[in-house]
Regions:
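An extracytoplasmic/periplasmic, membrane-proximal ligand-sensing/linker region
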Residues: 7-8, 43-45, 187-191, 272-332
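N-terminal (or domain-start) structured segment
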Residues: 34-128, 165-166, 174, 178, ...
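Short, low-complexity disordered leader/linker segments with a strong preference
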Residues: 1-43, 332
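Conserved helix-loop-beta element of the AMP-binding
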Residues: 130, 229-242
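Hinge/capping helix and adjacent helix->loop/strand transition within the periplasmic-binding protein
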Residues: 93-102, 117-203, 250, 255-294
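Short secondary-structure boundary segments
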Residues: 108-109, 146, 219-221, 237, ...
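Short, charged, surface-exposed secondary-structure boundary motifs
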Residues: 207, 242-246
């Protein structure tokens, strides 16, 4: 007797195998497969990656909000510093993490919309990352020596117009945001200014106080403002500064953006429900007295913005700096 299946039996078996395969594929592709029940999230500690060194103002702000958010998430938040690569090493670790919400991180903005334009990075800032929320901002500005004759930014511009290339200014590095925005302002005002890059904020401020530059742009030591050793002429930010009322912003004077913020990001494919849960917890943490007093001590403004509002701003900033860098000749 021939031990073989008939043609009909083979067809039936093939159909059964096909149906089983389809069923497995549907299950594997179903939303939420392999993910824990959102209602149980988080069921283990969350890793919070910070791409800067420990002890900086940014790092301390992360530790402040993480400590308060633990109360609402009922899980530990482990802060892990991954500095290097102009903040891209830590950002890459967030972008390539498992999209389960257990890896989140800090960004100030540039690793998403500026650095990727200037150098190759191991992530796509738009496709690989999403924002959970913003909880703070920075106080950056344009400043002169305390005894400078310039009392307003317009007076500084007038000097630059009358003295081409003699208005020297310091920032931290070439093609950083302060450098780009000062060149943008110079272009609008049709003046020529001279950029002098420094390795750090303190080095640039020392040069300013020593009379080696006319003005500085970017981060500054708040204690020097309080001691009247430097004078702020313009804030490099979108919103007026509560800490420095009366000082006009770049947005007010030139309608130019300065997208620097303290926000929490995660992998792009983390489910919306988990992102909302994280957003809610960190938003509550912002209202805790310890967080508020801590941010005040760090002299960092508290600003809330949802990821839904911030993500389009990231894309807008990416497009803006792409154009600005091309016009400066920094990229093709």
């Amino acid at each position: 007797m021939e031990n073989s299946m008939t043609r009909g039996e083979m067809m039936k078996l093939s159909i059964v195998q096909l149906l089983v395969g389809l069923a497995i594929a549907i299950v594997l592709c179903a939303p939420g497969y392999g993910q824990e029940d959102v209602s149980k999230f988080p069921s283990k500690p969350i890793t919070y990656i910070v791409p800067v060194t420990p002890g900086t103002g940014t790092d301390l702000s992360v530790r402040l909000i993480a400590k308060e958010a633990e109360k609402f998430l009922k899980q530990a938040i482990v802060v892990v510093n991954k500095p290097g690569g102009a903040l891209t090493l830590g950002t890459a670790a967030i972008a390539t993490a498992k999209p389960d919400g257990y890896t989140i991180g800090f960004t100030g903005g540039p690793p998403l919309f500026l650095t990727p334009l200037l150098e190759k990075v191991p992530y796509d800032p738009i496709k690989d990352i999403r924002t959970i929320m913003q909880y703070g901002g920075f106080n950056f500005g344009v400043y002169v020596k305390g005894d400078s004759p310039f009392k307003t930014f317009k007076e500084l511009v007038a000097y630059a117009r009358q003295n081409p290339k003699k208005a020297t200014y310091g920032t931290v590095g070439v093609n950083g945001m302060p450098n780009i925005m000062m060149e943008e302002v110079a272009k609008r005002e049709k003046v020529q200014i001279t950029h002098i890059p420094f390795k750090g904020t303190s080095e640039g401020q020392t040069a300013l106080l020593g009379g080696h530059t006319i003005f500085g742009a970017g981060d500054f030591n708040a204690s020097l403002v309080e001691a009247h050793e430097i004078r702020l002429l313009m804030m490099l930010k979108d919103e007026p500064s509560a800490e420095y009322p009366g000082v006009p912003t770049l947005k007010e004077l030139y309608n130019l953006p300065y997208p620097m913020y303290i926000s929490i990001i995660t992998q792009r494919n983390v489910p919306d429900a988990i992102v909302k849960k994280l957003d809610d917890a960190f938003a509550k943490a912002m209202k805790e007295p310890a967080f508020i007093s801590g941010m005040k001590e760090l002299q960092l403004p508290i600003i809330y913005r949802s990821g839904k509002d911030l993500d389009p701003y990231v894309l807008q900033s990416y497009n803006y700096f792409s154009r600005a860098l091309k016009e400066m000749g920094a990229i093709k």
